[in-house]
């Protein structure tokens, strides 16, 4: 018997009910109905309150389950005639076990309300009719089930736009990220070669693009790529080749420019990352390879590349995930343009920039939430699969 623990949990239960009863009652009512009286009931507030109510109840249930499991373990010890600690010893043992969780609890609660809560709220919005024409509090929202998902995949303009945007998003992610990784690796190997002099100076110069804030670099490139007065056309391409591509207004050339800018922005980080790994590879590997008569390509394929990928695979995967959601470059360069006839997204819009336009330009919150869920699902699945396939995580026991 543990009367002190029972008393504490009883007080906690009574306090929880007395403090949160009204909040939970309104929260669960609002979660199911989303309000009944326009202008009086704000469906957004009711949805948020309902989600918080669920989180509070889940927290209380978890504490109750922990209490039950602890009581079960104590009963097992009692049935085995094991020594039962006195209350003071139990309190010390409990403190020792729970102290690490106590330290991380503020961060955990912050994570729940900064990350988990918005995700659940977005998930809820995806199943409502929240758009410009019935936005609360003037109107109350309604649950529409999977209608928004059906709209995305069955109605012509939405389906065409979605597949066009996701195709470009995948091309953009794979091409831009792979090129920046390849360039970073190539430069790191060249600079790390023993015959190259002035390595510190060269490395400093190559890392400089990373030191400049990316939005400043993007705005500079916007001016350089301007169709009418940009230096790239007027001072380089037109005098030398007699051509002046429409970098901002032609879909193909806009995509080429975006990929080029991202390679410029992204390769310094990869270069610095690979440089550190290359310097950590023991020279004994290369000396042994030289004794065996290995060529430069064989040393790269069998020594350099495996070492680099093993050490940096998780970070490289995050590079792909980051570019998949690279909103800043797409929006600052030309806001996803130029426009495409018959679609509600620009020719260079990726999924994340399309979500921004749907939400803040067209106030189509429900469809923006649907696309956001698809983005999260794609990134999570791909990242999880790739992480599990990397040697780094396999050696740590996997996921």
Where are these regions (language model features)?
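Short helix-adjacent coil turns
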Residues: 1-2, 363
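Juxtamembrane loop-transmembrane helix junctions in multi-pass integral membrane proteins
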Residues: 40-47, 51, 91-98, 194-197, ...
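A structural signal for multi-pass alpha-helical bundles of membrane permease subunits
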Residues: 23-29, 100-399
């Amino acid at each position: 018997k543990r009367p002190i623990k029972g008393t504490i949990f009883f007080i906690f239960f009574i306090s929880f009910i007395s403090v949160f009863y009204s909040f939970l009652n309104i929260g669960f009512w609002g979660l199911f109905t989303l309000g009944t009286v326009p202008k009086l009931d704000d469906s957004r507030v009711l949805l948020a309150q309902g989600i918080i109510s669920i989180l509070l109840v889940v927290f209380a249930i978890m504490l109750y389950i922990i209490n039950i499991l602890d009581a079960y373990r104590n009963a097992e010890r009692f049935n085995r005639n094991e020594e039962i600690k006195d209350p003071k010893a139990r309190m010390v043992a409990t403190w020792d076990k729970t102290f690490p969780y106590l330290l991380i609890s503020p961060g955990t609660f912050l994570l729940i309300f900064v990350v988990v809560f918005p995700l659940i709220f977005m998930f809820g919005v995806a199943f409502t009719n929240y758009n410009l024409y019935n936005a609360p509090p003037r109107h109350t929202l309604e649950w529409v089930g999977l209608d928004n998902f059906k709209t995305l995949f069955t109605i012509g303009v939405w389906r065409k736009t979605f597949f066009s945007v996701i195709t470009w998003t995948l091309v953009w992610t794979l091409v831009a990220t792979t090129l920046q990784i390849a360039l970073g690796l190539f430069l790191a190997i060249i600079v790390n070669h023993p015959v190259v002099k002035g390595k510190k100076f060269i490395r400093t110069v190559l890392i400089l693009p990373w030191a400049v804030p990316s939005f400043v670099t993007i705005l500079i490139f916007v001016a350089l790529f301007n169709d009418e007065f940009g230096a790239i056309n007027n001072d380089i391409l037109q005098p030398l080749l007699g051509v002046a591509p429409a970098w901002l207004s032609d879909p193909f050339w806009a995509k080429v420019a975006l990929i080029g800018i991202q390679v410029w922005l992204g390769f310094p980080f990869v270069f610095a990352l690979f440089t550190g790994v290359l310097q950590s590879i023991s020279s004994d590997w290369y000396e042994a390879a030289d004794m065996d008569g290995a060529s430069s390509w064989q040393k790269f394929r069998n020594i350099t590349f495996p070492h680099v990928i093993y050490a940096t695979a998780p970070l490289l995967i995050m590079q792909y995930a980051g570019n998949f959601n690279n909103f800043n470059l797409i929006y600052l360069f030309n806001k996803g343009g130029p426009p495409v006839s018959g679609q509600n997204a620009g020719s260079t819009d990726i999924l994340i920039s399309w979500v921004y336009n749907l939400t803040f330009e067209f106030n189509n919150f429900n469809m923006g939430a649907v696309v956001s869920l698809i983005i999260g699902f794609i990134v999570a699945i791909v990242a999880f699969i790739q992480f599990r396939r990397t040697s780094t995580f396999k050696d740590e026991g996997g996921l």
